[in-house]
Amino acid sequence: RRFQYTAIDDATRVRALKVYQKHTQANAIDFVNHIIQKFPFRIREIRTDNGHEFQAKFHWHVEDLGIRHAYIKPSSPQLNGKVERSHRSDQQEFYQLLTYKGDVDLEARLDEWEHFYNFHRPHGAFKGQTPYEALRERLS
């Protein structure tokens, strides 16, 4: 079993994805460091559920980076609706169609899916634009 961590920009829907074998604070911290390197913009806030992987060590790591960490209300996944909706897309458009031969292959395929989602997949919220087209438009 693998656990997918997802970061999604609220304004553009640009996403970063990574899979881990466990939900741990160390993995959550690694993921934050990953998205800081990956996203072409400054991250001002990270919103998470109240899972054990997002507690004290994670919280203070994020705050020390100058990023606000906000928790959603317990038992309220709808408050993280963009992530939840993107997970449904992942399930329908990626995982259900996936055949892979191990962890390395899964990571490579997930990277391909992330690239497709960000650069080629049209989004209804942006009148058919991709997340990176929406980002370019916001920056121009």
Where is each model-derived feature located?
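Active-site beta-loop-alpha junctions of metal-dependent nucleic acid enzymes
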Residues: 1, 17-41, 45
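An active-site-proximal beta-strand-loop segment
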Residues: 1-16
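Short small-residue beta-strand/loop micro-motif enriched in glycine and branched aliphatics
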Residues: 14-18, 71-72, 96
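Distinct, well-ordered alpha-helical segments
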Residues: 32, 58-59
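C-terminal domain-tail junction helix/linker
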Residues: 56, 65, 89-140
